[in-house]
Amino acid sequence: MVNNINWVKLPVILDRLLRHPLLTDLNLETAIQYTLDFISAMGLPNVYVDKIETIDIKEYRGELPCDLISINQVRLHKNGIALRAMTDNFNAYPTHDHKEGDWYERGEPSFKTQGRVIFTSIKHEKVDISYKAIMLDDEGLPLIPDNPIFLKTLELYIKKEWFTILFDMGKISPAVLNNTQQEYAFKAGQCNNEFVIPSVSEMEAITNMWNQLIPRVTEFRRGFKNLGDKEYIRVH
């Protein structure tokens, strides 16, 4: 896995694509759409950045960050207690107010999301959301990793999608499209290995997780802070 990622602006990949005579009609808007589709389809964790944002919960709900892709974890801002996923079908729509300290408030706090809204089991609170987002530049355009394998794979993906349209219109032969599809298939596998295979440090943390005699059942509450620590056995 790539440990250190530098970022470049999307026009870099667009300039490379426009060198091809069959891609001269490609514009920035289309390139952005294909880039977001590619990032979503590949699901590479290092392509996203981790962010933490504190939001206000009012009347059991709050507004999620606009750049949120997926939620890592949610916790209460005041004491760091983690919220689990909501399992109550009616928890997000309570029929009456609950006083602080009653049986309802003493249960485990929970949350669920619908669209750009987060619902919690607590009426008024501040929560910290750890989430993954796409890296953006000052103009709000997505930044992409400055990695030669990633750039080539993205270039072939956009080329493949554009050539599919040209093939449907009868402007290119099947051999041209098949060659691009084959190139992309091989490069996609290489890109996946480049970004998914753990580094030596990550392998050490994974090994420590597996080699445990006593299961750690409280790591969720701590945000998995100590999950990768080595377990020591004291012999008295």
UniProtKB/Swiss-Prot annotation:
A GO cellular-component term linked to this record: virus tail
Chain segments annotated as transmembrane: none
Subcellular location per the Swiss-Prot or TrEMBL entry: Virion
Domain of life where this protein originates: Viruses
Listed Pfam families: CrAss_Ring_1 (PF24228)
UniProt keyword Iron, yes or no: no
Alphabetical UniProt keywords: Viral tail protein, Virion
Claim: Membrane is one of the keywords in the record: no
Role, per record: Forms the tail multi-ring barrel with ring protein 2, ring protein 3 and ring protein 4.
Additional free-text comment from the UniProt record: The barrel is composed of five stacked dodecameric ring structures. Podoviridae-like phages usually possess only one such ring. The tail is thus rather long.
Subunit structure and binding partners: Homododecamer.
Protein name: Ring protein 1
Organism: Bacteroides phage crAss001
